[in-house]
């Protein structure tokens, strides 16, 4: 199966208001990162993750302006495209991979690391490359 889209949320809240970001949230005491991803995915999108996998755990340095000492767990799963209703987090859109791979995109949240995570997932899962960024 060719996966050509990623579900992103256009955030309603700061930080990154009106910017696209992955689905996520904070770990509740006693939860594993995978358990958190399953819960957050369902709470925000009503999508049940079946086979979530941990890609990377990253701790932001203490001198990072936005996220000092924050731990980021990047977890992914493959799901069928389904409509997700707008809610308190924002508007959900299935965006083409090329949108994420655009190095000049100004409306993607964070440190523009989303495209790097997608590249790594493709390598791990041996997914054929079907995107090319052309200026």
Give the positions of each predicted feature.
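Conserved beta-strand termini and adjacent loop/short-helix elements that scaffold enzyme active sites
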Residues: 9, 55-57, 97
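The catalytic Nudix box helix
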Residues: 22-56
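Short, solvent-exposed loop/helix junctions and linker helices
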Residues: 30-31, 108-111
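Active-site-adjacent beta-strand/loop module that shapes the phosphate/pyrophosphate-binding cleft
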Residues: 60-88, 93-100, 104, 111-125
């Amino acid at each position: 199966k060719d996966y050509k889209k990623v579900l992103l949320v256009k955030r309603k809240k700061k930080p990154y208001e009106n910017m696209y970001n992955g689905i996520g949230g904070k770990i509740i005491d006693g939860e594993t990162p995978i358990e958190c991803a399953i819960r957050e995915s369902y709470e925000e999108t009503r999508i049940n993750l079946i086979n979530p996998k941990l890609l990377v755990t990253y701790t932001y340095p203490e001198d990072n302006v936005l996220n000092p000492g924050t731990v980021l767990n990047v977890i992914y799963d493959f799901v069928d495209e389904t409509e997700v209703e707008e809610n308190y987090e924002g508007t959900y859109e299935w965006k083409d991979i090329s949108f994420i791979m655009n190095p000049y995109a100004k409306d993607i949240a964070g440190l523009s690391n989303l495209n790097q995570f997608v590249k790594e997932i493709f390598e791990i899962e041996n997914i054929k490359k079907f995107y090319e960024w052309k200026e």
